[in-house]
């Protein structure tokens, strides 16, 4: 929990994050907003490691992890968020040849999916990213 906002409730879509955005609001961001907004990714894809770049980002406790793993809605929304971000990556190629925040986002998403859902989904996500890289070269 960060600033009295439940990460589980946020992922289930019933509570906004500390910026007053619901998960649906983030999914509705334009590509320009996705590229230029840097504090949403930690909410869509929380991990048990503090962010070096967003001190207000949620850090999952063991109880948060269990609650998310036991929430069908949170897991469904995590999967949707992963596909949403894959679609963003597929629409662009500038992220492929440079090490930038999108590469860090990809690492975070992979870690989040592994931690909260399963290793296979994490690997499928990374495989899709690699397919985009190959196709866009």
Specify the residue positions occupied by each region the protein language model found.
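Post-transcriptional modification and biogenesis factors for structured RNAs
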Residues: 125
């Amino acid at each position: 929990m960060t600033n009295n906002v439940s990460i589980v409730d946020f992922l289930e879509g019933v509570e906004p994050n500390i910026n007053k955005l619901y998960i649906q609001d983030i999914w509705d961001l334009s590509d320009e907003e996705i590229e230029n907004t840097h504090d949403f990714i930690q909410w869509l894809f929380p991990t048990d490691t503090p962010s070096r770049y967003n001190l207000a980002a949620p850090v999952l406790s063991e109880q948060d992890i269990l609650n998310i793993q036991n929430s069908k809605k949170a897991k469904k929304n995590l999967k949707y968020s992963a596909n949403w971000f894959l679609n963003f990556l597929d629409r662009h190629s500038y992220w492929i040849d440079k090490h930038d925040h999108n590469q860090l986002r990809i690492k975070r998403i992979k870690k989040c999916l592994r931690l909260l859902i399963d290793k296979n989904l994490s690997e499928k996500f990374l495989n899709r990213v690699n397919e985009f890289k190959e196709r866009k070269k």
